Amino acid sequence: MQTTLRTLFRGAGLACVGAVLALPGLWAADSDKNPDAFPTFDSYIKFSGYAPAIHGDKAAFAPRNGFSTSGSGGVEDFFYSKDGSNGVAIKMNGHALVGAEDYLFDLNLSKDGVGSVDVGYKRFRTFYDGVGGFFPLTGLFQTMGPEALHIDRGSFFFDAKFARPNMPVFTVSFHQDVRTGTKDSSEWGAIVNPAAVVTAGALVGTAAPANTPFIQPNVMTVSERHRTLEAGAQATVGKVKEDLKVTFEWVGNTDGRAYVRYPNGNALGVIADPTVAVVDDLETVTSKTFRVTDKIVAPIMENLSLEIGLNYSRVSAEDGGQWITPAYNTTAKAIFQTVTAGNIYTNARVDDYVGNVFLKFEPVSYFKMDLGFRDEYNVISDGGSFIVTSLASGQTVINAANTNTATDLTYSHLVDHVATPEVSLQYTGINKLSIYASFDKRINHGSQHWVNPYAAVTTTGTGVVTTALPSLSSAIFFQDANQDYVNAKVGANWNASSFFTFRAEVFRKEHQNKFIGSNDVVGAASYGAYYATGYNFTGVNLTLVVKPTPELSFTTRFQPQYGDMSVLGDVAITGGSGNEITSGKSRINMISESIDWAPTKELYLQGNLNMIYDYIQTSYPDVVVSTTSNIPVPFQNADNNSVTCSGLVGFVLTHNTDMQLQGMWQRANNYNPQISLGGIPYGASYEINNVNIGVKHKFNDHLVGEGKVGYFNSKSDTTGGFTNYRGPLFYFSIQYAL
């Protein structure tokens, strides 16, 4: 939706009128009087700006529509190219929009018979809404500090190519990507609903819900760096082509999350003493990657060719961080700064080997077959440690002498082997009909063993040190991990005539993960255990295009997808099988209709309707909110039903002026606040409608201007109306030929 609405104002211009002119045969009788007078400039600069006047929740408007609420202006697009007489060419393009913080500069220099250099920098901003949550039982709305959040993404790039005639082509590139800012997120953890009464950090009273919601909204602070250096060589010897690449990557990330343990404390009669802010899950990641890839394409005969690919990569990583969760200690009757996991340190290494071979066979012009096999082997090892603090048993005073510190150790090792055969077919021997099919099966067999975190060293506040070894029966695991995936599809495209086109495709996905406790080590924690999860999906894609006339077309799409999720767990089964349980069901039906009509030379109309019926049912659909008979038990699915309608009218006002009208309406009604009595309501209910009108005018052969105004309106029951917004947005642009 964000891309669509931004297109209305910036990227699309008045493209609908151009679509009118492109319809085949429409201008055949009067081509010398083509009313489209808008030229295509070889080099140009385009200045633009927009200004919203939004009432309501501006922080909700920005991420949904992709516009800065403070407006933006600058150079929307710039392009310059020039070819020299000695084979040298220069191209420059870019933009700089202040407010939206969207910038690009790209310089390309090339010379025939030598190569090219492309260097530049780009940066853009993505907006997020820091909504913490809405509690329908009390009507409370929580935001996480500043509600208007954003992430800035920047990238410097340098790409060079050396391509002399009859010589190998050499390439080198360097990219540095940066991601910084804050965004909304969520994690698994307990918060207390304001409907409950919290005194001195403890839940008291009988206010519903008695259970605690276990999804925490939080603010994620991001600071990430990613550098990539790559060198390559492409060579052709006879008919054999080879492409070799060597890549180095460096990653340095520091991310963190923060949330409020007791939201809306001391508000509207809700007593939270104290309201605890938690700085949770501070993570640092430093990694280095070395990768070498080689691809060879060798024709064996006229209708048979061989493709071989080899890849090796090694990743070395060090992770760190802190996980500090302040909590109320009922014995000491005070807040204790619990270090759930502090001074985290892990060292991991991954070695990955991949090889694939493909045979491409085309015995006749109307039949193609690809046979392939991919084999992958990887080894993953890591070990680490962290500290945990706790108040000594029975202590009522929080100080260093009463605090125990444990150093936990952990380790894991995984060996994985994946074999994937593939086949694809295409047949075009029937006039105007193309039939295709593909099948692949991913066979993954692995073995893993690990040591759950255990307190290797415990030090009391008085200096007493205790050491321990991991328990074989509770901390040490040996397990086989098998993951088998099957994907298949078959389809056909039938271009019966210019009046009728039909496309159909059926696909099937079957995925299953099995984890079997190894019997080689008697007494291990996973001895004899068996656990399996999986899912299967069957889907159909149907598309019908009907064109009664060159000026009128109907496109109908129907995409049903049905699937079941399953789980099986039985620690008493020794590597055998048990009764599989259907843990979830997914049913999706997507129906859409598009109509394009150009009744006259100067008029174009388009209408779209899209309906989605989507629900996921889990094995726990009933939400028990009360044991009394007067409160009904709600039934909860993860519904995602919605309806979207849009329409567009474009027409030519004069030889130099076009106009466009466009509107969109979307609605969903899946929210059931009654669920909050005993759980978390996942469904969303909202209504969005937007309209805009735009005019494009050519002042002369070098100058074109555009002006647009739109109105946005959004209502959300999911957030109790606290994120509603409405208001106009004004846009203008001037494009000048250089």
Where are these regions (language model features)?
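Outer-membrane beta-barrel "beta-signal"
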Residues: 697, 726-738
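Membrane-embedded beta-strand positions in outer-membrane beta-barrel channels/transporters
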Residues: 44, 75-79, 104, 157-159, ...
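Outer-membrane beta-barrel domain signature
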Residues: 62-69, 92-94, 143-151, 159, ...
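Outer-membrane beta-barrel translocator domains and adjoining extracellular loop/strand segments
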Residues: 56-62, 102-106, 120-122, 130-136, ...
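Transmembrane beta-strands of outer-membrane beta-barrel pores
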Residues: 49-53, 94-100, 111-113, 121-127, ...
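Residues that define the transmembrane beta-barrel architecture of outer-membrane proteins
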Residues: 39, 69-76, 99-103, 150-156, ...
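Transmembrane beta-strand segments of Gram-negative outer membrane beta-barrel proteins
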Residues: 36-73, 90-92, 172, 266
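Repeated loop/turn-to-beta-strand initiation elements of outer-membrane beta-barrel proteins
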Residues: 85-91, 113-117, 166-170, 180, ...
